[in-house]
């Protein structure tokens, strides 16, 4: 499928949002809308890293559990997690129990806490100029020069599990790029 498909409400959406009410709500209310704030962006960065190799629907279904397990993504709290917290998280069936991803989330919280700039300012500094919306799903890149630069800078600053593809997914999810298809009903994000 390359064009937005109509949902039961008659609206034309990006095709990935079809098939699940949870996907549809995420698409309509969150995805591609500009998001700022260190805690909110740390949450999205963490969830995008946990999604790597999995369906985003799995992450959406577990998002509330992730919020509880990771103290509402409070950066200072997560940065203070210990081996005991890693063990607790590994026993939590409500989240994705992947030790490398859990440890990366803690490492990333520590990296955010050590930043000399606001996380929001750092991430948004890689947002490219607005461009026309793509006509079809096949027109969407998996990564861009900006996402590669973001991933490099985050790695330099001690972040883990944030490669250029994950960085681009973060850019899409948080409105740094507007990758809703041209025929999608969601208004331009106007960032």
Task: Please annotate each region the language model reported.
Residues 1-191:
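HhH-family (HhH-GPD) DNA N-glycosylase catalytic core used in base-excision repair
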